[in-house]
Structures are given as C-alpha cells and as structure tokens.
Amino acid sequence: MQTNDKKVLITGGGSGIGLILAKTFLNAGSKVIICGRNLEKLEIVKQELSKIEIAQCDVTSDEQIKALLEQCKEDFNGIDILINNAGIFNIFDYQNGKLSIEQQVKEIDINLSGALKMVHYFLPLLLEPKEAAIVNVSSGLAFVPLTAAPVYCATKAAIHSWTRSIRWQLKGTRIKVFELMPPLVDTSMVQELKGIPKMQLDELATKFMMDFKHDKFEITPGPAGQLKMLSKWAPGFIFKQLNKNI
C-alpha cells in the first residue's frame, strides 16, 4: 500500500497509538486528519504538528460521523485510508460491581460499534479512489483475553472476526482491509496494569508501516504474534500465563 500523497483519517488520533500513527503517516508523505471527542486535546496536537488536520467527532454518534463525512468530502475531497483506532480500556471485576452496566456498554459502543459505524458511512467514499484502505486496530488480546479487562478483550475479538469478514466481502474492490493487532503498548490507557511488559509506541509504528507498505493484512507486532500462535497451539497454557498475576 502506498502512503505518499494519501489522505488518512484516524479516529482516536489525539493520543497513544492513534497519534503515533498520525506522525508516522505524516513522515511518509500523507495528509493526515485526526478526530476525537476531546477538541482541546486535538488542538494541542495541532500546535505541535501544524500540518495535521483535526476534527471533533464522537464515533458513537451517527450525526457526528455524518458531519465528519461531509467535512472530509468538502475540505479534503475524500479520503484514501480510514484507521479505526478509537477505543477505551476498563479494568474491573464483576464481583465488586465497580463498573456500571452503562460504562460496560459504552466500552462496546466506542470500541466495536464506533468502528462499524465509521465503515458503514465512509465505505462509499473509500470506493472512489484507485487505491484505498481500511485499518482496524484490534489487539493481541483478541486471541487470548486478559481477564482483568473482559469487555475490552471481547470487543477486540469481535473486531478481529468482523475485519476478516469485511476483507473477504471487499476483496473484489480497490479497498484493502488491514488489521493492526498490537500487544499491550505503553500508553496512558493501560497505565493501571502493573508488572506486564508493554511495547513502545515508536517500535509499534515502525513495524506497522513496514507491514502496511508490503500489504501484510494482519499485522501482529512484538508479542502479539506469539499470542496469536500460542492461542492455536497451547491455548490453555498461554491463557494461564497471561493471567497468572491477576
């Protein structure tokens, strides 16, 4: 997949994986638009990266997604690459009841339904360029769940299954469908998890871009590849190893 002169839209682009991908695509010659719920956070990024474009959008809102779609049409004459990265990560135990059902449903709405909505509304626009791509960010935890984050892992497993399906459905089009499956990455989202190794953002971005340019549709940086393999060959062992300190 080429990156030069491509127009890239990244959800959840104000921090973490979304932001490092934005920087990576900028360095690769792409025009980058990041969106997120927190406009103040996006404006801070804009101050640092003047070439980046920002747009406020909550991916759980159909109306805000439609408005973002119109903005991409009018201001950028479409997009070439959609990266569904927006997500939240909640650690909780059902026995203590500290996370409300509303918070659990919100995690599903952002992590899973948000990506579905973005593809639903943006697909016609992505069918226009000669070459386009959808990148869904799931997780190595799609293969082996971390029991401390049950809803997060369930949403990422669903993203993995859904991505395989839409890749198959779109194989006769000009849209390439990628899935980035990171291991735990050193971001503020998972700072509550102690004692578990985390991948550095720049290392993740380097691996992603190398595989993206070579059309490797399932990208498993670092330990994520091991999780995927061991989930097939030794599922009980790797599940216990991952969760032994939880």
Map each language-model feature to its residues.
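Residue(s) in the substrate-gating loop at a strand-loop-helix junction
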Residues: 139
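Conserved glycine-rich Rossmann-like NAD(P)H-binding loop of the short-chain dehydrogenase/reductase
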Residues: 28-43
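The beta1-alpha1 cofactor-binding region of Rossmann-like NAD(H)/NADP(H)-dependent oxidoreductases
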Residues: 57-67
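Conserved mid-core segment of classical short-chain dehydrogenase/reductases
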Residues: 66, 89-105, 148
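Active-site helix of classical SDR
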Residues: 119, 155
